[in-house]
Amino acid sequence: METPTPRVKPGFNGVGVGMGSSVNGSSRRAGYYMGPAGAVAVAGGGRAAAAAPVDGCSVALRVFVLAATLVSAVVMGVDRQTSTIRITVTDALPPLEVPLTANWSYSSAFVYFVVANAMVCLFSAAALAACRSRAAMVPVMVGDLLALALLYSAVGAAAEFGILGERGNSHVRWPKVCNVYGRFCERAMAAVIVSLIAAFANLVLLMLNILTIHKSSSYY
């Protein structure tokens, strides 16, 4: 009987333990690898499929992005206000009172904002479900990059339209409307701010994912 010869193999963090032995001419190998997700057993001469390392901070950020984008999409999606506008036709006639409605769907920027936040919310839910799959790490990272670009573009478009409604544009004689639709503008502003915070959280999440893939690259 041969004496078992220990073999050390690198794991995710360069730390691993292996044991090989040969009995009656047959070779057997067993061991385990230590990584961020714990010990991964390997036996029978093969390598077990390792689960992706799960970072609690990344999961918390993912849940926050999901919740924040959901809130932003819902708040903007129900934003609507009807106000009575006085219109003077001639000085000889009393002003006419006309009810006018401001709705988020009347602005293409706000429509894009709602759709973008809804898409990022759905992607965050799918990424949470796939967070333990090592094969999904790179696709999720690419998705995070696209989600980040989508959020920032949506926030920029909605913020620009909101500033136009708040201040108007004297160069083209566009009057401000937030003095008439105050509640509508406040809700839109709140949705944009929450979505901007979600975009920052998504940026941090993307950086953490890149760092995780870099640390575990020695496994391959």
Curated annotation (Swiss-Prot):
It is found in: Cell membrane. Keywords: Cell membrane, Glycoprotein, Membrane, Transmembrane, Transmembrane helix. Residues 79-108, 166-187 are extracellular. Glycans are attached at residue 103. It holds the Pfam family CASP_dom. It is a multi-pass membrane protein. GO terms for cellular component: plasma membrane. Its main location: membrane. Residues 1-57, 130-144, 209-220 are cytoplasmic. InterPro entries: CASP/CASPL, CASP_dom, CASPL. The chain crosses the membrane at residues 58-78, 109-129, 145-165, 188-208. It comes from the Eukaryota. Belongs to the Casparian strip membrane proteins (CASP) family. PANTHER family: CASP-LIKE PROTEIN 1U1. Homodimer and heterodimers. NCBIfam families: A_tha_TIGR01569 (TIGR01569). This is CASP-like protein 1E1. The lineage of its organism: Eukaryota, Viridiplantae, Streptophyta, Embryophyta, Tracheophyta.
